[in-house]
Amino acid sequence: MRQLNYYIFISTILTYNLTHGQGPRPVIRVGITAALKTENGSIGWAYTGGAVPLALQYLKSHGYMLNFDFEFHVEYTECDLANTVRAGLNFMKTNNYDVIIGPPCAPALKMMGTLSTIYKKPVLGWGFVSESEISDMNRFPFVASVLPSTKTLGVVTSKLLEIYGWDRVALLYFKNELDYCSSVVNDVEKSLYNESKSVQIVMKAEIDGSNSESTSATLQVVKTRARVILFCAHAGGEKRFYLIQAGLLGMNSSEYVHVMLSMRSVGFGVQTSVGKKPLTLSGLPPIWESFTVNPDGMEDLAKSVAAKMIVIDTSSEVRDKTFLQYMTKNIVYAIREPPLSCKVPECLITNATGMGAYARHLFDVFYMYGMAVSSLNSTDPNVYGNLSLLIPKFTTAFEGMTGEVKLNEDLARKPLYQVYGLNSEYDQISLIDISLINDTVNVVFNYADGNTEVWHFWGGTRPPDTPVCGFLGKSCPLPIFEQYRALVIVAIAVTILILLAIIICMSSKIRNRRVEQSRLHSEWQIHAIKLRLPMHRRASKSSQESETESASETENFTSKSGDTMTSEFKETYTIQYLENDLVLTTAHQVQELSQAEMMKFVKLRKLDHENLNKFIGLSIDGSRFVSVWKMCSRGSLQDIISKGSFSMDYFFMFCMIRDIAEGLHYIHKSFLRHHGNLRSATCLVNDSWQVKLADFGLQFLQDEEEKPFKKNMLWAAPEVIRGSLSIEQMDSSADIYSFAIVASEILTKREAWDLSRRKEGYEEIKYAVKKGGQFVLRPDLHIDIEVNQTLLALVKDCWCENPEERPSAENVCKVLFDMTPNTEDNLMDHVFSMLEEYTSSLEVEVGERTKELTLEKKKSDILLGRMLPKQVAERLKAGQAVEPESFDLVTVFFSDLVKFTDLASKCSPFQVVNLLNDVFSNFDSIIEKHDVYKVESIGDGFLCVSGLPNRNGMEHIRQIVGMSLCFMEFCRNFRIPHLPRERVELRVGINSGPCVAGVVGLSMPRYCLFGDTVNTASRMESNGKPSMIHMSEAAHSLLVNNYPYQFETNSRGEVIIKGKGVMETYWLLGKMSLSNQSTPPITKVNHKPRKIASFTDSELTNYSFRSVSPYVENLSDNDDEEIRRVLRREMMRVEV
């Protein structure tokens, strides 16, 4: 491209003001590197260069630079690095200019900044120069810019997402020749990963502003993944293009939030001289207007999307809006006039309108320099380019055309961001001010009620990042009226239609089933009836014989796989019989199978390799799909490693690692292309200690399943953990990473990542692997035996952070083949020699296991005694059946913590558990003091009974009543540590009557109660009141008849009880003192003597002896003489 340059001199250079007797005025020489034909709408010199003379005019109108003249030299480098170097040398070395206005693009400015460190010349930055590297004072100490770093934009974006609770976002950006938005988005993405652990970028895509079809396709994908969309556009046309495309796809509903990322201080505005009604805050026309000669009629559509948009931008509040409008209209004319007098064709376009996006930044950076030089008040030419003198002046705040401008010590603009929205009049308003001071984020809210001032276009509610009805809108239930409206309107007609539909559907279903069954009779389909558990192998045998044979049939597997298997293996696989062979089965959820998926089963069954576990088939005619695999009797590799009792030397480890690599290589060459779930739990070991890979090729059956083991992610590659790949998108490199983790387990003889010895937990490890970075986290390779160092290097290469740098499975196999030890023994011979050594230590281990078994038996006996009555537990241990037992009269107790749900809502889960533990532990202590059996506790409820399993005559009613009063006394005194003002209240129900008790179930047997007595006791509790003991009439009669004058009760009256009708019930108020007892008449006719020998000393002390004189005369001869003497003496003392 032809290089253009020219010199412009102000006419007053080297002139003398003879009137005032002054010498020639100082001349400041300014070198300008501009772009004439690059990004005209943003940094094009014809649309931005006029900002320099306008800034000079503005300076002089405010009393600055009155005694200075300027010499301008412009070179059009077009952001080319070579041209930039040539221009920089010309400015700094050859002509020794005072100050350089740098190129308006980051790579070229960094080159110019490098030259400035050599020649010590200040460089002023504007345009696309927000990259974080430019603000590095160590690299570019002479570069000053009026734009903040894009790194700060990322921090502000992360803070906004945190404020509004959005964790799931999409990230879109427009591409242009300078890759401005690409650099912005990259810095924002890094900040989101560093600042927030919860934000997930579900999609990151580039938008072509010239291709509406590709943009529409991209937005269609966004609609299925996100509702909060972050996007970056560098020009006003791109912003309006995005709004129109989003509106055409219906993304202007209340579900969507569009967040525009900007650093140009324009907010919702566009820098142009054409416009209808400018925005009040920025003085710029809104982005939804059409600025072409022939409007496209899309203003309303774009406006509807803009209403659902918020903007993160540097402060755009311009104080002098009059001059801004003047600048917008005259900038293209100012460049044609002195002092610049641009005469190139681009500057002389007669119909040119509008102002470049970064013209205001060019204005501010030159205005900042002019103020700094003026404030020095010196005519010494050496100070004009002395940055050490200018820096203190640069850091002085001033009001420019981009709002308030103030530079920090790094000569980058102190970021003052504002979150903009639109009010009900579609005028721009500032919602939030966010500033960064010393790495501290300061947030100032400019609204009082977010629902009315922020989210009014969203229906007054902040939209979530995930819609209630799902991203496809299929999760919302239909309203009941819509479901049954046809039945209400045409009931008779619908009935007839239903009958016809049933007949048609049944006929069609029968026909389709026959066709489907005939089509599915293939080699991979296994009928569910052919699969059976080992204990049901022969139904003709007796139960005891069947159990004996089942034990012998599975003895081989148990002895080889070990006494214990991991819970994951038990959850994943079930051992069953297929005909007469043991197989491994895995259950899957039922789903519709396509023709392609069924053909995949045929291909899976044909896969045959010595290091792949054979896929036998799939059962699809049961309640769940069941995949059937060949039996590997030694269990999984995870079982062998976790057990830790089998010694593995280097040859053994090497053979296992080689087997895994060979199996993985075969899968990668097959139609599967990847395993997708390689872990030590999916590496099975057969009789010959040969490792076989399993659980491959069926991921599409597991997509809808809940994964019970979250620690499976410990084997997943970083790109998989980040969620950027679906199962279909995974490739072989992710398997290579998982292979490295499994190999580390084998070499270290410890489970993945050795969590028991690491200070990091699962979540910390997962986050560190997901985050990546320069220093990545990987398992430790602490090996206690001598191994080939090449093998360790291979493992480290396989878990490389970059998937492209990981070796392929084929290369791994080649390296392992070259490392094969020189020995003629095979693995089985090696295993036999190891077993011979192992046998010598077997006796010692058997003795230790016997001791452990005895100890565990004692523990199990204690635990069983706590779960079941002693006599029941002994019968169960002896293998005897426990027959149900009937009890004529028992007392049943039910209790419930009142409003426990409300109380639990004020506590954390750990506090709830601790609260229940404190309360129920004290309840258990109270129960131990009474002849009461605790049946069970369910949640916050208690069920107890007295009178069974040990019969105690009529004592059961007194034991239950006494225990209930103790419960109430404890609740009155109990205080919740973390909620001292809250009280625990108990509601108790008591009933007496017959009952049947017995042990129910084989797995986790429980001692259960049956009978209407239990139901009535439950009704007493549910119909009671807080801190009250509610008794049925049966319990009350039993209490007052057998223990009169010992407990105080009160009739509640008749109450309607569910399932019982009207019942008269009673309140138990407490123990009755002698002062509260009814005094019987003093008469000896038909008097029945009454004993009080059962009273305790504490009770006698608390009684008022003024009311017991009538009882003294009624004592029988059989009463304790000592009690009579004490009572008489005390009564005489009181009367005196």
Swiss-Prot record:
Region (Disordered) residue spans: 536-565
Keywords: Cell membrane, cGMP biosynthesis, Chemotaxis, Glycoprotein, GTP-binding, Lyase, Membrane, Nucleotide-binding, Receptor, Signal, Transmembrane, Transmembrane helix
Principal EC category: lyase
Catalyzed reactions: GTP = 3',5'-cyclic GMP + diphosphate
Statement: the UniProt record of this protein carries the keyword Transmembrane helix: yes
GO cellular component, one term: plasma membrane
Sequence ranges on the Cytoplasmic membrane side: 507-1136
Xref: SMART domains: CYCc
Segments forming domain Guanylate cyclase: 891-1021
Domain Protein kinase: 533-833
Membrane-spanning intervals of the chain: 486-506
Main location: membrane
Pfam families in alphabetical order: ANF_receptor, Guanylate_cyc, PK_Tyr_Ser-Thr
Function: Guanylate cyclase involved in the production of the second messenger cGMP. Regulates chemotaxis responses toward Br(1-) and I(1-) salt ions in ASE right (ASER) sensory neuron.
Family assignment from sequence similarity: Belongs to the adenylyl cyclase class-4/guanylyl cyclase family.
This protein's name: Receptor-type guanylate cyclase gcy-4
Species of provenance: Caenorhabditis elegans
